[in-house]
Regions:
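Glycine- and acidic-residue-enriched helix-capping/strand-helix junction motifs
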Residues: 12-23
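Radical SAM enzyme core and accessory elements
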Residues: 2-5, 15, 31, 36, ...
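Glycine-rich beta-alpha loop elements in corrinoid/cobalamin-binding modules
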Residues: 2, 29-165, 379, 385
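Catalytic cores of alpha/beta
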Residues: 105-108, 354-369
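Radical SAM [4Fe-4S] cluster-binding motif and immediate context
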Residues: 172-347, 357, 365
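Flexible glycine/acidic-rich beta-alpha junction loops that bind and position SAM and/or redox cofactors
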Residues: 12-13, 99-103, 150, 209, ...
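N-terminal [4Fe-4S]-dependent radical SAM core
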Residues: 11, 142, 148-200
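Glycine-enriched alpha-helix->loop->beta-strand junction motifs that scaffold or abut catalytic
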Residues: 112-114, 298-304, 371-373
């Protein structure tokens, strides 16, 4: 069967475009099953999906099914894409983070153009559905699948499948991506072309930690790691066969088991696969690190590590964020990473429930103390499926009109708490203050950045992002909205004079 696998365009500030790795896994699984997948990533396409649907019809080889993935802010775009595909007679299937949290919503009568919904990791079950449709057999309910019955009622299997043996999955179908249209992952090293051949790799799925702000519905709470042999084989393929210029490890927590992480580093070194720079895109868990691990990572080609610091107040970290780490462990991780010669990046969150001016000031002070090469200060967004969302629903109110309001870069999903303490306007002021004090009010940092080639090659996008970041986007009434998050790959590093004009 000819199948389109599609991803709506995430409307973020960042000009960087990264490969949607999940579609690569689905495509490889379908192809191994004898089907013919085509990947449509709206983020890098110049034409709408119907262009390819019509082109295939004209060639006499029409597509029969479309599978669309969507996070919460993009579910509206996914519905629109499904409606378009249905008008051409395609079977429509939805999956991804939002569908895992709210699977039945997309099968309501107003979405009669959606045929099937999957939750959880759907590589195997999606293939089984396509096989069934190809053979003309009646569709039976599969694990994690939701569909309509004969009378139009929604029938559901509420399990959320997790693939135990990740080695059983084929490597992502990178040959189906238009690699030249994607950008490098981060401003990683001087001299790396912006449109370098950048690939991501997933060495594990799942995370056992219970951070209240984190939504991890698809991969779940159970951590499952690929074997070191399997990871090294894919790494070798990326370096030697696909000629990667950089690699990004995108696990939620790839270093959960330090012995495995160290073994992987030793193998990369021993097999000469340490010549391509790489980074930990989603960061590392500080309480699963030591100096030896960072030294091995450096020798294995790693250039930068990120850490989820989140907050500088011990009470907030322990009782609200529930990160499962201490400030002492945070400080040790930064110290050891720097001692190993790695660049560091810190992720900080402003605006969790119970946040006060004092706790936010503690976060700013900690960021200045740790002094990472890059700092990303984020505004908390109460995504459905998170403990934070439940906390606010129980003790406050969320001001969001529709799912697009949950776009983390727009900050339209503001909320208030009934405790009389939380102040969303104060949160935004302190968040902006954090960026000013970290990036603008320390001349030595400005001069350090200006001395690097990457500063000047990134200048156009930095200016554009800075203006949009500090001025915000205008809503339909012409008012400036507050942006909720700077993209991790686009930290504000411009000179003080440029940003002062934007403030």
């Amino acid at each position: 069967m000819r199948v389109i696998l599609a991803s709506p365009e995430a409307k973020v500030w960042s000009e960087r475009k990264h490969i949607p790795l999940g579609l690569g896994y689905l495509a490889a699984t379908l192809r191994d099953g004898g089907h013919e997948p085509f990947i449509y990533d709206a983020a890098i396409e110049d034409v709408p999906v119907e262009f390819y649907i019509e082109e295939a019809e004209q060639q006499g080889k029409p597509y029969e099914l479309i599978g669309i993935t969507a996070a919460t802010p993009l579910i509206g775009d996914a519905w629109q894409m499904a409606q378009t595909a249905k008008s051409y007679g395609l079977t429509t299937v939805l999956g991804g983070p939002h569908l895992t949290i709210m699977p039945r919503e997309s099968l309501e009568p107003r979405h009669d153009y959606v045929d099937y919904v999957f939750k959880g990791e759907a590589e195997h079950t999606f293939l089984e559905l396509v096989d069934t449709l190809q053979a003309g057999r009646p569709v039976q309910l599969l694990p994690g699948m939701h569909m309509r019955g004969r009378d139009g009622e929604i029938i559901s299997d509420y399990s959320s499948p997790m693939i135990e043996n990740l080695d059983s999955l084929p490597f992502p179908a990178h040959d189906l991506f238009k690699i030249d249209r994607y950008t490098n992952l981060q401003p990683l090293t001087d001299g790396l072309d912006r449109h370098a051949r950048s690939f991501t790799i997933l060495t594990s799925r799942g995370c056992p930690y219970k951070c209240t702000f984190c939504s991890k519905p698809v991969t779940g709470d159970t951590w499952r790691g690929r074997s070191v042999d399997n990871v090294v084989a894919e790494w070798r393929w990326l370096v030697q066969d696909l000629h990667a210029s950089e690699i990004g490890v995108t696990d939620d927590i790839w270093n959960l088991k330090m012995d495995r992480a160290k073994e992987l580093m030793r193998r990369l070194i021993a097999e000469g696969l340490n010549t391509v720079p790489w980074t930990t895109v989603h960061g590392m868990k500080v309480n699963h690190t030591d100096l030896e691990l960072f030294q091995l990572m450096k020798a294995a080609g790693c250039k930068r590590v990120g850490f989820g610091v989140e907050n500088g107040d011990p009470w907030m970290l322990r009782n609200v964020i529930r990160k499962g780490q201490t400030l002492e462990q945070v400080r040790d991780a930064f110290k050891n990473a720097k001692a190993a010669g790695l660049q560091t990046m810190g992720f900080f969150i402003f605006g969790m429930p119970n946040e006060t001016e004092e706790t936010m000031e503690a976060t700013i002070q900690l960021a200045l103390e740790l002094d990472p090469d890059l700092a990303n200060f984020m505004l908390a967004a109460p995504f459905p499926g998170t403990k934070m969302y439940d906390m606010i629903r129980e003790g406050g109110e969320i001001f969001a009109n529709d799912w697009p309001d949950y776009a983390i870069h727009e900050q339209r999903s503001r909320f208030t708490m009934n405790d009389g303490i939380y102040n969303s306007d104060l949160v935004v002021r302190k968040w902006r203050d954090a960026y000013r004090r970290f990036y603008l009010y320390r001349p030595e940092r400005v001069w350090e950045k200006m001395s690097k080639k990457s500063f000047w090659t990134e200048m156009p996008s930095t200016i554009s992002n800075a203006r949009r970041f500090f001025l915000g986007n205008k809503d339909q009434n012409g008012h400036h909205g507050h942006n909720g998050r700077v993209n991790p790959e686009e930290p504000v590093t411009s000179v003080k004079g440029i940003l002062d004009r934007a403030l």
